[in-house]
Amino acid sequence: MSFVIRPAGMEDLQHLYEMAKLTGGGFTNLPPDRNSLTGKLEGSQTAFARRGDEIVGETFVLVLENTETQVVRGTCQVFTAVGHRWPFYSYRINRLTQYSKELDRTVSAELLSLVNDLEGTSEVGGLFLHPGERAGGLGMLLARSRYLFIAAHRHRFGERILAELRGIIDERGGSPFWDAIGGKFFGMSFQEADEFNAIHGNQFIADLMPKHPVYIAMLDEEARKVIGLPHPSGRAAMRMLENEGFSYQGYVDIFDGGPTMLADTDKVRSIACAHHGEVDEDTLEKGEKALIAAGEFEDFRCCYGARDIRGDAIAIDAQSAELLGVGTGDRVWSIAR
């Protein structure tokens, strides 16, 4: 079987909706709501069609297609700048140290502060691979294709990139973190708040969430111990992000307390090490395993293949050339697998 990453279109709505129903809670970028998904696809098509260098709040939706069956089996998203349409809120973990001369005692406490520090940062997110395809490195293909897309359209993205990892969700679909903070102010369960946010944005957080810092020590133990931890299903994703140069810098999601990972865009490994060159006239039979991408905007494609870098040129295998629709002299991006 062969797979290719390509821009999503309205014809992919049903496949995306079926996958959205498989995600479980805490996956706001792929809500199981047809109207929301339709709006996301329409916005993505507008972003792909726009030309220009200015950075605005856009979302590019990509899908993983089985080219033999034409069935979509995964998806991922790239956001040019968060916080344009709706405020982008995070909790930042701070430390406050105080000293009492009378008691001769120093007390240090950790606080959760509601902040907009990350507004304007680009984001990679929305990655979901159908459970039936979780073998053969397709999750890695989805994840790293986003970086080659950014490399190919660097002028449309910011100086930093973030990635939010889903936090700990219990067996009932609830969030200990939400129950300890947000749930006390909104009268909503975690799933209700999560679904509302996915469809309507998080302005309601700005309207009702307390603005004063929250002392972590005052939260119950169940909430404290999940702060900054990814959901077990996201641990591999966290390792992949760390391998790309992302790090956890004390920002957590306001809903489930999951970690927000950050990196300088030009230092992300798959961007910094990406090779850009013209396709050589020789067809490669064997070579270095790689991710190879070609095309701009709505013509973007990415797949696994083989390459041989020859200075400014690159030889690639015949199957990749066919999947990407490239020939001699066309330019491609690639990164070692």
Indicate residue ranges for each PLM-predicted region.
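A generic structural signal for residues embedded in beta-strands
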Residues: 332-334
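Long, charge-rich alpha-helical interaction segments
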Residues: 181, 190-208, 214-225
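Anionic-ligand-binding alpha/beta catalytic cores of soluble enzymes and soluble regulatory domains
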Residues: 215-283
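Conserved GNAT acetyl-CoA-binding A-motif
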Residues: 118-127, 147-166, 176, 225-228
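Short amphipathic alpha-helix that is part of the acyltransferase structural core
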Residues: 1-90, 218
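Conserved acyl-donor/pantetheine-binding loop and adjacent beta-alpha core of acyl/acetyltransferases
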Residues: 80-126, 191-199, 205, 209
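Short beta-strand-centered segments at strand-helix junctions
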Residues: 305-329
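Conserved acetyl-CoA-binding loop-helix of GNAT-fold acetyltransferases
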Residues: 107, 111, 126-129, 134-150
